[in-house]
Amino acid sequence: MKIKKYFPLIFGFSIVIIIFVILAMNKGPKAILFYGDTCPHCKNVDEFMNANKTREKIAFKKLEVYNNQSNAQLLTQTAKNCGLDTSAGVGVPLFYNGDTCLMGDQDIINYFKQQ
C-alpha cells in the first residue's frame, strides 16, 4: 500500500534526476579541434591560438588523433557526418564547430579570426 502512495513522488523525482543528468551531459563544448602531435599544419593553428588567446574566446575540445585510436575514429565519423570523403583517410587539423567541418590550418585560422 505504501508503494502506491509514494509511487508518484518517486516517479516524479526520478524524472527530475534524469533531466538534470541529460542537461549536464550536453553542457560541454560541442566544437572539437582534431590534431596530430607531429603535424606541422596543426602547429600553425596551435601557435595562432596561443598568440590570440583563442581558447579564452571559443570553447572546444582538442583531440589528438595520431596516438589515440578512439579519437581517430571520432575524427573519421565527424568527417563523414560533415559529408567529407574519408576513403583515403582524413587529414588534420580539422575543426568541427558543431555544424560544419573546417579542414586545414588556413581555414581554421580564418574561422578563429572571425570569432
Locate each region found by the language model.
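Thiol-based oxidoreductase modules, predominantly thioredoxin-like and allied folds used
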Residues: 57-74
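Extracytoplasmic/secreted envelope proteins and their assembly/folding machinery
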Residues: 46-49, 72, 76-79, 109
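Short pre-active-site segment immediately N-terminal to redox-active cysteine/selenocysteine motifs
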Residues: 35-38
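Typically the conserved alpha-helix immediately C-terminal to a functionally engaged Cys/Sec
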Residues: 42-57
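Non-catalytic, surface beta->alpha helical segment in thiol-disulfide oxidoreductase systems
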Residues: 91-115
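Hydrophobic membrane-insertion alpha-helices, especially the h-region
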Residues: 9-24
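Short, structured active-site "lid" loops
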Residues: 77-99
